A protein has these predicted regions:
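Conserved nucleotide- and phosphate/pyrophosphate-binding catalytic cores
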Residues: 156, 162-335
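Short, histidine-centered active-site or binding-site loop motifs used for metal coordination
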Residues: 14-16, 47-49, 146-147, 204, ...
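Internal, conserved structured core segments that host functional sites
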Residues: 116-168, 172, 192
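Short helix-capping/linker segments at secondary-structure and domain boundaries
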Residues: 105-109, 142-149, 253-263, 291
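Short catalytic-loop micro-motif centered on adjacent basic/acidic residues
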Residues: 82-85, 149, 232
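Short, polar/flexible loop-turn hinges at active-site or ligand-entry regions and domain interfaces
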Residues: 56-57, 148-151, 235
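N-terminal Rossmann-like or analogous alpha/beta NTP/dinucleotide-binding catalytic cores
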Residues: 2-138, 282-285, 295
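A generic secondary-structure signal for well-formed alpha-helical elements
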Residues: 68, 75, 103-106, 145, ...
Length: 335
């Protein structure tokens, strides 16, 4: 018990806005599964963030449940990790509003993700999209997280979280722990198969560029065989000049555990066809047990329900302690 208390805490989550991608698995979930013994881990289905873009309600519910099943199938043991749905813990919305009042307009205006999402959703530039970083800060600060596993493109959100926490602490005394980003060196940023200069994303209009965790093996192989490479016909790791090949090498390296020098030697003198097939097959085999276990878990709705209810209870216990402290410091009258 003593050692558990001293563990550093981790908080992260993924939006259930669609099917989980290979990028989500290799860049995030796979790494999370290895952290439970060393850290006190909280992982959420970030459904509140998801509605900044219009969703089909029934699909959002389905994706949330599938994501929970995929988390577990990927090795996130509910006995070792707190797995919960963001909207099941009201403190997220409650602290989110308080932090809105301590977040400056200029800070939010500079966020690159707001600019990117606004450009993609010009007909729905809502306030939630703009204040997204304050809610994300609430997600992190509620749990007094030490570390936040994020992709390199989300480091800015952790930085603004630290700024908000520092501002609040400066006004009211130590309230929030300042989190640090945790960015894994390998598999941190998996790129699109068709546009390897862009991150693999479920919102990509060209679905051939995105591989899904629960996709059929034949579809995964087809996408890898069509993956963009170059005219050089040489398997060599060079992200600047050979982004497509380098992306495939990174995927193959993470899937097989082989380093880049070994991969280059393995495919020396061969064309890209055999290389792309090998990458596709390695991904199929990597994801096969996860897909099968996810399907098994989805057939046991009562078990999944017990997991997310227990997770919400554990998460709320920690979150409400932080929220009570915040409410007292800002001057809210206790109930």
């Amino acid at each position: 018990m003593e050692s558990e208390v001293q563990k550093k805490r981790i908080l992260s989550g993924i939006q259930p806005s669609g099917d989980l991608t290979l990028g989500s698995y290799l860049g995030a979930i796979r790494n999370w599964a290895a952290l439970a013994d060393e850290y006190d881990c909280y992982y959420m289905m970030a459904d509140m963030h998801t509605i900044t873009v219009r969703q089909v309600p029934a699909e959002l519910r389905r994706h949330t449940l599938v994501q929970l099943a995929a988390y577990i199938a990927s090795g996130l043991d509910p006995e070792k990790n707190v797995l919960f749905v963001q909207s099941h813990v009201p403190a997220h919305a409650q602290l989110g509003w308080v932090l809105d009042c301590y977040t400056m307009f200029g800070e939010l205006s500079r966020m690159t993700q707001f600019k990117d999402k606004s450009a993609k959703n010009a007909d729905n530039i809502n306030a939630g999209l703009f204040t997204y970083p304050a809610l994300m800060a609430a997600d992190i600060l509620l749990y007094q997280a030490d570390l936040v596993p994020v992709g390199g493109d989300q480091k800015q959100h952790v930085e603004i979280c630290r700024d908000i926490a520092t501002r609040f602490n400066g006004l009211y005394g130590d309230t929030f722990k300042l989190p640090d980003p945790y960015i894994p060196k390998v598999g941190a940023r998996i790129m699109s198969l068709t546009t390897p200069t862009s991150k693999m994303s479920k919102s990509d209009k060209d679905q051939n560029g995105c591989v899904y965790m629960l996709e059929k093996p034949e579809d995964i192989l087809r996408k890898f065989k069509k993956a963009m490479t170059d005219s050089d016909a040489c398997v060599r790791f060079d992200p600047e000049n050979k982004p497509g090949v380098s992306n495939l090498m990174q995927i193959y390296s993470v899937a097989t555990g082989r380093d880049y020098a070994t991969i280059e030697a393995e495919f020396a003198g061969q064309g890209y066809g055999s290389f792309k097939t090998a990458v596709g097959e390695s991904v199929v085999e990597l994801l096969r047990p996860i897909r099968e276990e996810t399907e098994r878990l989805l057939a046991d709705k009562s078990y999944l329900e017990s997991v997310y209810r227990a997770g919400a209870e554990k998460a709320a216990y920690v979150a409400n302690r932080t929220l009570s402290k915040v409410y007292k410091k800002v001057g809210f009258l206790a109930r």
